[in-house]
């Protein structure tokens, strides 16, 4: 459906961003969220949930490469990976590029998101849903990590912001469950918002994660759609060395994996753990 309307994001009060809507691709209120997918001339197809942009075709690769390749290459030998959320399929797509991984489980609370995105954002999953290693579980993420008997080497929480259905994925109950089902030397990562505008989210996540993990920090990337500066990703493990790998080790692992990335490289990996002083100060308070 062609349209000349403007779509305004409602994440922050007093300022924000807008998108021209060239064509509505899909719009529906699911059991959990109000979902819309539309065409924008600059960014391609855009998906928004509850008034907040989740992903665009133009810049999604930055987010998904950093959420996957940083923990997977830092670990070095992951066999079992858990994705919480990620219904658009792009996180799965990037994880599937690691051929040594044996099992990939994705837990998505909203089956509708998976269905919509497979049809209307096919470039995001790029066929990854058909990978033989993949298993989809429709469940609440908190419930899954606290009930499953499976163990994982890396857990990637591709959560929305801590409002609505995504709120539970920022709780101590969720973090404790993730710690419970991680193997030794396992790594947990999660999106944690744009820290200049959502600093409290980072501080709260750091405080809660520190109850369950010995080494908690953040790494970062600048993603145009998530305006306001750098986006921070929570990092939690019990092995500090995994966050401090030397360039030679990362370069060797990157080469062995045979990855051809558009944003990620070993130098970006190393530099992403350098955080601005205002965030370091907030975390130290």
From Swiss-Prot:
Homodimer or homotetramer. Transmembrane segments: none annotated. GO terms for molecular function: spermidine synthase activity. Pathway: Amine and polyamine biosynthesis; spermidine biosynthesis; spermidine from putrescine: step 1/1. It is found in: Cytoplasm. It is an enzyme of class 2 (transferase). Spermidine binds at residues 64, 88, 158-161. S-methyl-5'-thioadenosine binds at residues 33, 108, 140-141, 165. One of its GO terms (biological process) is spermidine biosynthetic process. Gene3D superfamilies: Spermidine synthase, tetramerisation domain, Vaccinia Virus protein VP39. Disulfide bonds: none annotated. The active site is at 158 (proton acceptor). The lineage of its organism: Bacteria, Pseudomonadati, Pseudomonadota, Gammaproteobacteria, Enterobacterales. Catalyzes the irreversible transfer of a propylamine group from the amino donor S-adenosylmethioninamine (decarboxy-AdoMet) to putrescine (1,4-diaminobutane) to yield spermidine. One of its GO terms (cellular component) is cytosol. It catalyses: S-adenosyl 3-(methylsulfanyl)propylamine + putrescine = S-methyl-5'-thioadenosine + spermidine + H(+). Pfam families: Spermine_synt_N (PF17284), Spermine_synth (PF01564). This is Polyamine aminopropyltransferase. The keyword Cytoplasm applies. Its EC number is 2.5.1.16. It comes from Erwinia tasmaniensis (strain DSM 17950 / CFBP 7177 / CIP 109463 / NCPPB 4357 / Et1/99). InterPro entries: PABS, PABS_CS, SAM-dependent_MTases_sf, Spermi_synthase, Spermidine_synt_N, Spermidine_synt_N_sf. Keywords: Cytoplasm, Polyamine biosynthesis, Spermidine biosynthesis, Transferase.
